[in-house]
Amino acid sequence: GTARSWFIYKKSNPWHYYQWGVFVKGTRSWIHSEMYRGTSNKKLIASTYNGLGTNQTTACIRVQAGNAKLIYDIAKTNRYSIPIRIYRSSNKGPFGKITLNDTTGKIPGNQNYDPTDPAFKNKR
């Protein structure tokens, strides 16, 4: 697809019903984790995790918590805006959905945490 260049920058939010949100300047979009039922990483809405890679919102780019934290940390520690390219493609690139060993890539509907969240690395 046709790529559009944008920038992520320090206007960030560690919590707002998602983890590690970073604003994409020049758009109304944020890059952030899947949705939670509040400001706790133990209140994940499992269906939003299982829906990663599908079109669920009109503006935001949702990624697994581990990738959201990586992007957040890069944006927060960088002095300047960081260029990114957003485009539609079947190639998921480095931020494609990670399927953990011995899993289907989906989580049970009653699971309340993201298995890629660094806070839960011992539960993997």
Region locations from a protein language model:
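Exported/periplasmic cell-wall-interacting domains
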Residues: A3-R124
